[in-house]
Amino acid sequence: MSETALDLARALISCPSVTPQDGGTLGVLESRLKASGFRTHRLTFHEEGTPDIDNLYARFGSGAPCLVFAGHTDVVPVGTATDWRFDPFAAKVEDGQLWGRGAADMKGAIAAFTAAALTFIEQHKDFKGSIAFLITGDEEGPSINGTIKLLKWAAEQGEHFDHCIVGEPTNPQVLGDMIKIGRRGSLNGILSITGKQGHVAYPHRADNPVPKLMRLIEALIGTPLDEGTDHFDASNLEVVALSSGTDAYNVIPAKAEARFNIRFNDLWTPQTLELELLARLDSVAEGTAYTLTFEPCNALAFITKPDQFTDLVANAIEKQTGRRPELSTTGGTSDARFISAYCPVVEFGLVGQTMHMVDERVSVADIATLETIYTSILEGYFP
């Protein structure tokens, strides 16, 4: 590994960029890219009720094909800083590890790809094609003023991407474990029933909505939504909260509601899920009036089917680690869901065991290997 990758990772981690703060991270990255000939654009996106977010777009070259790297420089809060072995923004190197908030998720990967890209450009000055960066400060937050708007802006400028790598920490245990080739969708909903409040000693004067809610919940979770597909696990509806608006033991509540989340595969859309849930509820409602509402969904299921590009990435990983990575769609959502509407996308970064945790850290050796993997991908992509 050139010192550039580790130095850049430390410089990025040293910037306290807890969403929505940038902390100077984009300036650090932009200066490196500009110095190597990238055209850069800093963009601040706005939306009422949300914080303004800074974003960075950079591109070297103008021809096709274009390989774009996408990532986020924002990080989650550190919690109690004194619980950490080292200052979470000191970017300390100790015991062969780089310590700090964002080391795994995902400043280490941004640094590794940047170092790989700069070295590749220096060694292949006349390569045919383009390398681009989509970097946001709004991935750990509401994801409203980040990648989704950056992609729209790029399309309006006539920018075209052929393939994308997202530097999420995809490896559960060791580097080379896993490539993400898709993600499940995510849909939030609320099921509510209105009854009549009353004293528990006089139930005939009230209408308790809780037993009715329990019966309807059973209709939602009693039968699996599906059995999964070739690339996805079965879809899952998980009830995450129950409430009735009162903590008193002697009061029958006037209203009861259940909040739930569905992680769904490529057999479903938010619209077909809504129809399925309504059909299940109506089959057992027996005259019970209910309300079923959903939050707006910006997390659809997507898949990049295995092809030459996924083989290129997998081969580069196997060459450097000796492991053939699993092609997976497990885990939560990421900004890859937005990118999938523009080009095929895969995710591969560092090991994610400590992401979002106290004492987040990554192996310095893994940063070196990841840089080499990214370099191998670039060399295979632009022969």
UniProtKB/Swiss-Prot annotation:
Domain of life of the source: Bacteria
Entry similarity comment: Belongs to the peptidase M20A family. DapE subfamily.
The protein's name in its UniProt record: Succinyl-diaminopimelate desuccinylase
Active site (catalytic residues): 74, 139 (proton acceptor)
InterPro entries for the chain: ArgE/DapE_CS, Bact_exopeptidase_dim_dom, DapE_proteobac, Peptidase_M20, Peptidase_M20_dimer, Peptidase_M20A
UniProt subunit comment: Homodimer.
Ligand binding (Zn(2+) 1): 72, 105, 168
The reaction(s) this protein catalyses: N-succinyl-(2S,6S)-2,6-diaminopimelate + H2O = (2S,6S)-2,6-diaminopimelate + succinate
Coiled coil location: none
Record-linked NCBIfam families: dapE_proteo, PRK13009.1
Single GO biological process annotation from the record: L-arginine biosynthetic process
Pfam families listed in its UniProt record: M20_dimer (PF07687), Peptidase_M20 (PF01546)
Keyword Zinc among UniProt keywords: yes
